[in-house]
Amino acid sequence: MTAIIDIIGREILDSRGNPTVEVDVHLEDGSFGRAAVPSGASTGAHEAVELRDGGTRYLGKGVERAVDAVNGEIFEAIGGLDAENQIQIDRTMFELDGTPNKSRLGANAILGVSLAVAKAAAEAAGLPLYRYVGGPNAHLLPVPMMNIINGGAHADNPIDFQEFMIMPVGAETLKDAVRMGSEVFHTLKKQLAADGHNTNVGDEGGFAPGLASAPAALDFIMKSIEKAGYRPGEDMYVALDCASTEFFKDGKYVLEGEGRTLEPGAMAEYLAELAGKYPIVSIEDGMAEDDWDGWKALTDLIGNKCQLVGDDLFVTNSARLRDGIKMGVANSILVKVNQIGSLSETLDAVETAHKARYTAVMSHRSGETEDSTIADLAVATNCGQIKTGSLARSDRLAKYNQLIRIEEQLGPQAQYAGRSILRG
């Protein structure tokens, strides 16, 4: 009854107007699942490969080759298989691809099918996706990391760090957390406008003002939290995504906006200084993706009191994560489904992290769609944190709105992670 009878891949557009893959999966019993694949702007060198067409069409960014793989080879290989056997389906696609990084068929093709299969199986079981994937204990609503100021590769301004986020840990519920974040977001907009800054929003819905440094951005955020009626370091904390690989050159960290170049040890000390001055509870990619010594220095310095998240470092890859665990590097993994390219491998990465007492943060990409799958996966894995952009742009709000629905569905079972995510 849950055999796959049809798979339809198509090329659609993401939130940046670039092509991406969408997949429909139909089952024998009439059940249906649809998934759209996200895409990143700053990508790690060790990520699974997103297949693009090249040439002049869509300026080389078309995904017709990946769509053809979905409608051709992949359907031929998994048509007739039971949608409830996720691991078998994913493994069949890995073997069909035959490369270590999914570069032949494309991680975008494989992931689209993988997620759509899970959604179809959930519908066949009469369960919401979070319950189907997570089982009866899926009940924890994540603390949002809300990206309200953008720099780096996500903005055309002098700020070197890529994202400045707020985390409403003092909320009682996810719904309250979204409200608190929205209030701070709109307060920040007024503060920026009053000081003559641009308030246009970037790829992820955050503002990209012409501020010169990380401290300048953090000072604005502190003022906005207070003006919105909340207490920094009590109701609301701050998280950073440095995306340090983007400015790591010849073994040094070149902070052009701040006019200085730092050795890895000095970069670690600078981040420790910021974490001491501001209520920063999470730093993502504080060091470059292959600067393992720098990561170790940063972890030794503040890993006992600050969440240190590996994004480009781990790329949702359990093998790289295990290397980091052995070396005592970082203490958290950012989980992006398209970095690894399948649902089963994504779940394995979260499980590997939790077994080692590392935290996991479910994450969007800068190129998103209205697909809200990651909201369900955050609850399914009880990971307790989600990074899905600002309080603007419907591609970001789709995830927050889905979390509000899930919290409502769970009723008294629902628990907001809140302060439980804090270290030290």
From Swiss-Prot:
Binds a second Mg(2+) ion via substrate during catalysis. One of its GO terms (molecular function) is magnesium ion binding. Pathway: Carbohydrate degradation; glycolysis; pyruvate from D-glyceraldehyde 3-phosphate: step 4/5. Its main location: cytoplasm. It catalyses: (2R)-2-phosphoglycerate = phosphoenolpyruvate + H2O. InterPro entries: Enolase (IPR000941), Enolase-like_C_sf (IPR036849), Enolase-like_N (IPR029017), Enolase_C (IPR020810), Enolase_CS (IPR020809), Enolase_N (IPR020811). Its cofactor is Mg(2+). One of its GO terms (biological process) is glycolytic process. It is found in: Cytoplasm; Secreted; Cell surface. Mg(2+) binds at residues 241, 284, 311. The active site is at 204 (proton donor), 336 (proton acceptor). It comes from the Bacteria. Its EC number is 4.2.1.11. SMART domains: Enolase_C (SM01192), Enolase_N (SM01193). Keywords: Cytoplasm, Glycolysis, Lyase, Magnesium, Metal-binding, Secreted. (2R)-2-phosphoglycerate binds at residues 162, 336, 365-366, 387. One of its GO terms (cellular component) is cell surface. HAMAP family: Enolase. Belongs to the enolase family. Catalyzes the reversible conversion of 2-phosphoglycerate (2-PG) into phosphoenolpyruvate (PEP). It is essential for the degradation of carbohydrates via glycolysis. This is Enolase.
